[in-house]
Swiss-Prot record:
Name by which UniProt lists this protein: Transcriptional activator protein
Cellular component, GO, one term: host cell cytoplasm
Protein's organism: Tomato yellow leaf curl Sardinia virus (isolate Spain-2) (TYLCSV)
Record PTM: Phosphorylated.
Entry keyword Repressor: no
GO biological process: symbiont-mediated suppression of host innate immune response
Location of this chain's protein in the cell: Host nucleus; Host cytoplasm
Zn-finger (unnamed) residues: 37-54
Length: 135
């Protein structure tokens, strides 16, 4: 007996409950990284070349990225016997910012950018303002 469905693909879908059950059984391949501050994070084993900043310190997930950010005697730059490109020999200067709070811009009393091109804002009636508020 032929199907009355107009679809040419007649394969059945796996129910969502079964999909969730399969996904829960699958183990996530990741490793735990403990930071000096006491925090820890997990990184997927297939995730490379991604870094992030936590409490003002940049953390890297790949050995190539660590080579740029480590700047002490434990750095792989000083222990690697291979010839390095000349770009690594340039000293990268990092500034230690003691104040981690970024200043906010002050509020102005002038026209906003959105309404700066509208003529005669003083001529708007109460019904006009109620219309704008309803949007």
């Amino acid at each position: 007996m032929q199907s009355s469905s107009p679809s040419t693909s007649h394969c059945s879908q796996i129910p969502i409950k079964i999909q969730h059950h399969i996904a829960k059984k699958r183990q996530v391949r990741r490793r735990r990284v403990d930071l000096d501050c006491g925090c820890s994070y997990y990184i997927h084993l297939d995730c490379i070349n991604h870094g992030f900043t936590h409490r003002g310190v940049h953390h890297c997930a790949s050995s190539n990225e660590w080579r740029l950010y480590l700047r002490d005697n434990k750095s792989p730059i000083f222990h690697d016997n291979q010839t390095q490109p000349t770009t690594i020999q340039q000293q990268i200067q990092f500034t230690n910012i003691s104040n981690q709070v970024q200043p906010q811009l002050e509020e102005g009393t002038g026209d906003s950018q959105m309404f700066s091109q509208l003529p005669h804002l003083d001529d708007l009636t109460v019904s006009d303002w109620s219309f704008f508020k309803s949007l």
